[in-house]
Structures are given as C-alpha cells and as structure tokens.
Amino acid sequence: MSAHTDRSSAVTVLGLGPMGRALATAFLEAGLRTTVWNRTPGRDADLVAKGAVSASSAEEAVAAAPLTVVCVVNYDASDAVLRQDAVTSALKGRTLVNLSADTPARSRDTAEWAGRHGIRYLDGAIMTPATTIGTDDAVFLHSGPEELYREHRPVL
C-alpha cells in the first residue's frame, strides 16, 4: 500500500476482522474514500468515526467503489458473500482483490469464476502482521494479470 495514492480513488473492504480493519484504516489514512462491510453488523463504528462509509449490504459495498478488497478467514467465507447473485452482478466490470487464505486450487477456481462473470480479479496473500499494514514493512503478494496489478498498485 503506497502513500502516493490518488486521493479521489475509492475502495471497498469486505471483512472487518483484525486484518480487514487494518486495511481499511490504512486506506482511510491514505486519503481513499473507503466503504466497509462486515457480516457481523456494528463492527465498523470506529472506522466510520474515522471517515469510512458503512454499507448495509455486501452488494451496496461493492457497488460503491471500482476496487473491492475482501479479507475474510477463507474462500468458503468469501464465496458465501461474493457468489450471491446480487453481489456477483454488482462486481461485474469492477476489480476484486481476494486476500483470504486458502489453497492454490481455490484461488484458481475463484479466478475462473470471476472471469466468467466479467469481474477483474487479483488473488493475494498478506505476509505480515496487521500492525505493519500501511507501513513500508508490510508485505503483500498478488497474482493475476500484470496490467491489472499495475493499475491498482498505488492503492495496493
């Protein structure tokens, strides 16, 4: 995540566990319009106080920004949210970055699903503790189309 982001950019974060919260905070501190959503309501109050927009549904959240970052426990959890018809439709033509943990086979399956639905997709992994998110010490791995990564690199 770079401090040299376009201040007019918008990002959505799905999943507000420790890592999702750290990501949303870093996006806010970088000056990005940040929309947040979590399966458990009410986990976003402190982020809203910092300037985040609370979405009432995952569909509303992904429709709010051209870039959605999902960070939940695993692909079963991300699939339960992303593969709902309304959410899948809202993601069409947008970029999805999945930072949830799972197997390479699940990553490939999700990339294929995204492609079938017109969703631009990057898979990722966080290789750092939440306390380093937003600093030069944070380490992320991303895979997918290089041009898509380059497009979003200033934010990621």
Sequence positions of predicted segments:
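Short gly/ser/thr-rich secondary-structure transition/capping motifs
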Residues: A49-A55, S78-V81, L122-G124
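Rossmann-fold NAD(P) dinucleotide-binding segment
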Residues: E59-C71, Y75-R120
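Short amphipathic alpha-helical segments
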Residues: A24-A26, V48, A80-R83, R108-E112, ...
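Rossmann-fold dinucleotide-binding core
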Residues: A101-L156
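NAD(P)+-binding Rossmann beta1-loop-alpha1 motif at the extreme N-terminus of oxidoreductases
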Residues: M1-A63, L67-V70, R94
